[in-house]
């Protein structure tokens, strides 16, 4: 007999493991169209969760993830039993994405949302040269580096963490501005920014030092400038098991050795 206390819509990464999990869960709890669902259940890794967060942005439908992938920082443990009870007891967190506007020499500006980060990285062996402006004021005249990123709290445990950036609580009203392999200023380790600021990154010597920009998985090649800010009218809700909340996850990650 199916448990129909919650109307669930399941999405999966398409791997054998996630499809098998989806089949078992649908048999037990049923499956409805996304527009009729109370909750979206994502099965896979963090990539699957990011796609679900993008797909269901501004729909008002919370997303509960279960790990059937290789990386699952945004996912809960996969357990078939008592899924509706776990969902109803889960902790809700609001995710607000960034909006990137990337400009190039010979094409219209490209706008894209990023839940994790907007990153710039060098296209060739030549280091990038980037001028960084915050709310109209130049804060760094020239950053020589392999790249630089603006990360959200949700994205602070991803590429940002690999680049030695800070981990941010989800509710923190902050963004992380983190360089990748900075050469000059050599000791500049990045900055924490109020979430309401607008960050502009202008590329210097673009013909000699081409740079690509990426908003999560949306790439724009050979950019001349990139503007990043929090998207003013976009949000989505993610659910975490209470015994494995975001706060617990970031504490565990910071004391991992």
From Swiss-Prot:
Pfam families registered for this protein in UniProt: NAD_kinase, NAD_kinase_C
Cofactor section: a divalent metal cation
Gene Ontology molecular functions: ATP binding; metal ion binding; NAD binding; NAD+ kinase activity
Subcellular location: Cytoplasm
InterPro entries per UniProt: ATP-NAD_kinase_N, ATP-NAD_kinase_PpnK-typ_C, NAD/diacylglycerol_kinase_sf, NADK
Active-site annotation: 46 (proton acceptor)
Domain of life, per lineage: Bacteria
Annotated keywords: ATP-binding, Cytoplasm, Kinase, NAD, NADP, Nucleotide-binding, Transferase
GO CC terms of this entry: cytoplasm
Positions annotated to bind NAD(+): 46-47, 116-117, 146, 154, 157-162, 218
Enzyme Commission no: 2.7.1.23
Catalysed reactions, as listed in the record: NAD(+) + ATP = ADP + NADP(+) + H(+)
Annotated GO biological process: NAD metabolic process; NADP biosynthetic process
Cell wall biogenesis/degradation found in the keyword field: no
NCBIfam families with a match to the protein in the record: PRK04761.1
Role, per record: Involved in the regulation of the intracellular balance of NAD and NADP, and is a key enzyme in the biosynthesis of NADP. Catalyzes specifically the phosphorylation on 2'-hydroxyl of the adenosine moiety of NAD to yield NADP.
Family: Belongs to the NAD kinase family.
The protein's name in its UniProt record: NAD kinase
